[in-house]
Amino acid sequence: TIAFKEPIDSPFLRFEITDALSLDGRSIASIGELDVLVDEAPEERQWQIIEPADTSVSVLQEVILRFAKRALGNDPDQGLIEASLAIAQRSMDQGDPFLTALKAGLKTLLCSPSFLMTPVIDPQDGPSTASTLARILWLSVPDDVLIEMTQRGPLNREDMRGQILRMLQDARSQRMVRSFVGQWLGLDGFDQVTPSLKLYPAYDTLLHHFLPKETEMFMAHLMRENLTIDHLIDSDISFLNQRLARHYGIEGVVGAQMRRVRLDPASHRGGLLTMGSILKMTTDGFESSPIRRGAWVSKQLMGNPLPPPPPSVPTLEPHHGLEASLKEQINQHTQQAACRACHKIIDPYGFGLESFDASGQWRERYRVIQPHSGTFQYRPEGYYQWADPVDASGTLQGQSFRDIQSMKALLRQDLKKVAYHFAKVWFHYASGAEPTLHERIALHAMIPEDPSRLGMADLMTKVLIHVIKDDTR
């Protein structure tokens, strides 16, 4: 019996058989340990709400008021409190259990603009600061430690720095990591593209589940360990399990548990650019799409603003196996003056990632779909044939590169730009607003001339203190 922790929408699941044997006339297949089916929720999400002995209306009011002060600060809107209490009391009057009524009241608070929308931050109001920090870093309410500190008065910069670093270490920060990474890197749209089973028959449900987890765990590790910002471009660590390692061609990782893995330089992996989650979602599921990938690198990592394509120019999706090579097709497209400016910026980044297919695997040659007759039926060998050799070379800002490693080396020369863009993205996430010119100048001043030693948590802390202490919006 296999128990899944969440409903499964797919009518069937495919697991890759890792071992098979015949015993007493029966075939036995092993698919390894399915740790994916175990609830990975942090411990605090597994707490149970216990109904108190006294379930009177007065206790209901006391709990809601205490929660409101913690979630919204010491001085929550009285009208919101009254509305929450009224909904909870009406639920009790209708015969609902105490906990059901309480949840209805608390839901009213959590769905209110006061909680969901970014409030005006008063750095002199300690409880307001506590609520703001918890909302940003935990997507939750402050804990007792934070409340105690802020009740003694406004936090100075050093105290605030200490609290931010402590909160990043807490397991509750994983909610922020998932939300922030989903918005910044586009992982919220990870499920929108699925690699074709004709071209990538080994792509299965387990791999689909673990690919984004690698990225989330990697980013959480950078933040909690305060690793340097250059790990975004290239890194010697990642988080893998056996299924991911097999997909990447990395040996020595056994079991379904995700764990930190030291990457060999020969693995072609390291940093965000070579993660399967990024590589998969920047394709159409068939082709690797250097234009889509290049646009992603340019916008999400480098921070280059991209204007919308001209309305009169048709979309280009280059295909392999045609008379013209992939680069020739793109170069023909960019002969038009209206297209040349943007493609000059984005295409080189995409060319550097051509050694990875639409499922995120390393490749030496392109795959093209092999024509077949009849209705499509899944088969392990797929429906493809090998085509032209991959060309991952290009020119970036006048400097040539031959592959992903040499392109990364060029990107590291622009590390200050990467760090500055990350600061802007984190500011936007924390404040709920794009930085103004004044704020962009302040953010730029936070980046040293040599950002290779700039810690991720250090930069996030500086930006967050600026959001709270220097808020003039």
Residues of each region from the PLM?
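Aromatic, loop-rich ligand-recognition surfaces of beta-strand-rich domains
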Residues: 1-54
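Active-site substrate-binding loop specific to GH73 endo-beta-N-acetylglucosaminidase modules
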Residues: 44-428, 440-473
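Axial heme c-ligation environment in periplasmic c-type cytochrome domains
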Residues: 431-434
